[in-house]
UniProtKB/Swiss-Prot annotation:
This is Large ribosomal subunit protein eL15. It comes from the Archaea. InterPro entries: Rbsml_eL15_core_dom_sf, Ribosomal_eL15, Ribosomal_eL15_arc, Ribosomal_eL15_CS, Ribosomal_uL23/eL15/eS24_sf. GO terms for cellular component: cytosolic large ribosomal subunit. It comes from Saccharolobus solfataricus (strain ATCC 35092 / DSM 1617 / JCM 11322 / P2) (Sulfolobus solfataricus). NCBIfam families: PRK04243.1. The lineage of its organism: Archaea, Thermoproteota, Thermoprotei, Sulfolobales, Sulfolobaceae. The gene is rpl15e. Keywords: Ribonucleoprotein, Ribosomal protein. Belongs to the eukaryotic ribosomal protein eL15 family. GO terms for biological process: cytoplasmic translation. One of its GO terms (molecular function) is RNA binding. PANTHER family: LARGE RIBOSOMAL SUBUNIT PROTEIN EL15, RIBOSOMAL PROTEIN L15.
């Protein structure tokens, strides 16, 4: 069976030699450009097509740049130790990809976010490409695969966590549900602490033959 074009695109993208040569030059160019840029065509065609992208009217590709780290945390103007300022060491509750989708949706309020994918990162930023659709375009209205975006229940879907990035952060992936998320594990461990049970991170957690755990 012959391999498809998308197979070779994926192999090229995962090649370390290609990342050091081509992608590095692209990142240098992207850093000089604005944070939100509309593109003529997707950088990763295989990922865009997997999200439902079609090369026809009504589809728009946008590249969004998001700063890495804890983003902008307001620094308190009242007196306290710098250690207690609460500025450093905190990560945003949302994923970077979800943040990028929301920024693209605010930039183009007449479009709806269909999906997004990662395209690169450097020491300061992460870059994502957002697949957006114009639900009012006649081509989209007549497309049976994408006319569902006209429904009022799908309006501003990115701000309600209905995209893939939003569902991932909310722990709503169909493959696992809420039971495998970080929030679920934290709540479970917190309940064990309150009930004074053996914590799963304990060194002697699996040593059931001991009546008394050493050091406790």
């Amino acid at each position: 069976m012959a391999l498809s074009m998308y197979h070779y695109i994926e192999n090229t993208w995962n090649s370390e030699e290609w990342k050091k040569s081509v992608l590095r030059q692209r990142l240098i160019k992207w850093r000089k450009e604005p944070s939100i840029v509309r593109l003529a065509k997707p950088t990763r065609l295989n990922r865009a097509r997997s999200l439902g992208y079609k090369a026809k009217q009504g589809f728009v590709i946008v590249r969004v740049r998001v700063r890495r780290g804890g983003l902008n945390k307001p620094r308190p103007n009242k007196g306290r130790r710098p250690k207690r300022m609460g500025v450093y060491g905190y990560s945003p509750a949302k994923g970077y990809r979800w943040i990028a989708e929301e920024r693209a949706a605010r930039k183009y309020p007449n479009l709806e976010v269909l999906g997004s994918y990662y395209v690169g990162e450097d020491g300061l930023y992460k870059y994502y490409e957002i697949v957006m659709v114009d639900p009012s375009h006649p081509v989209i209205k007549s497309d049976p695969k994408h006319k569902w975006l006209q429904d009022p229940s799908n309006r501003n879907r990115v701000f309600r966590g209905l995209t893939s990035a939003g569902k991932k952060v909310r722990g709503l992936r169909k493959s696992r549900g809420l039971k495998g998320t970080v929030r679920y594990k934290w709540n479970r461990k917190q309940k064990e602490r309150e009930e004074k049970k053996r914590h799963e991170a304990s060194k002697y957690y699996k040593l059931q033959e001991y009546d008394k755990i050493p050091g406790k």
